[in-house]
Amino acid sequence: MQPLRELRRIAVIGAGTTGRDFALRCVRAGFDLTLEDVMPSRLRSAAAMATVQQTLAAEALSGALHLASTVEEAVRDADLAIDFVPDELESKLEIFSMIDRMAPPRTVLCTPSDALSITDLASCTYRPTRCFAVRGSLTTPGSLRLLHPPTADPAVLSAVADFFTQLRFSPVPESDPDAPMLMKNLVGK
């Protein structure tokens, strides 16, 4: 496992409304951000991107916004990758697996999920100590539950909490409260 470095390069996978809002929040906070979506029209939406670019220019931000046409391109040099795909087990497993294969070993995986066990998702990667889930609104500052599997690396957990703090959230780290269903299913077979 590569040593932890500061989380400065962020990949956002999913450029729907929430993904774009979160990406803009990251750039405003000074992060180098790459945004990717499976639907290129979301990235190239003239009105949406013009608004984002005008906002960024008007605020003279220190962060940078890059657009990627593939997940591989988006996560190539990411310190942290966060997805905004539907909160369904199959979708999350697919995107976690894809990012896990394509991103450098140091990359932290993060996902907003109100229902899925991060322990399950982490167990399907080669980096279970670097996987986290957030619960709460990512569009307005406030309290966020930062869920981690029992195997989480404390230094990485601290870095992820600091990242969300820089975005004006109040992360509350806690161990995954959800029963890992995938592991239960495997044990029962």
Language-model features and meaning:
Residues 10, 28, 61-83, 159-169, ...:
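Amphipathic alpha-helical segments at domain termini/boundaries
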Residues 38-41, 55-109:
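Rossmann-like NAD(P)-binding element
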Residues 34, 50-52, 151, 170-173, ...:
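Structural/interface elements that position substrates and couple domains in central-metabolism enzymes
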Residues 5, 69, 76, 126-129:
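Structured loop/turn residues at beta-strand edges in well-structured enzyme cores
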Residues 1-53:
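NAD(P)+-binding Rossmann beta1-loop-alpha1 motif at the extreme N-terminus of oxidoreductases
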Residues 24-27, 75, 100, 122:
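A structural alpha-helix within SAM-dependent methyltransferase catalytic domains
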Residues 108-176, 180:
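Rossmann-fold dinucleotide-binding core
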Residues 19-21, 90-94, 116-118:
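Short glycine/serine/threonine-rich phosphate/pyrophosphate-binding segments
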